[in-house]
Amino acid sequence: GDNFMRF
């Protein structure tokens, strides 16, 4: 999966 801007 994507891990962009995951906070």
Curated annotation (Swiss-Prot):
Residues with PTM Phenylalanine amide: 7
Cysteines engaged in disulfide bonds, as pairs: none
Domain of life of the organism encoding this protein: Eukaryota
Main location: secreted
A single cellular component GO annotation: extracellular region
Annotated keywords: Amidation, Neuropeptide, Secreted
Tissue expression summary: Expressed in the CNS but not in the ring gland, midgut, thoracic perisymapthetic organs (tPSO) or abdominal perisymapthetic organs (aPSO) (at protein level).
Subcellular locations according to the entry: Secreted
GO BP terms: neuropeptide signaling pathway
Functional description taken from the UniProt entry: FMRFamides and FMRFamide-like peptides are neuropeptides.
Family according to the record: Belongs to the FARP (FMRFamide related peptide) family.
Protein name: FMRFamide-like neuropeptide GDNFMRF-amide
Species in which this protein is naturally found: Delia radicum (Cabbage root fly)
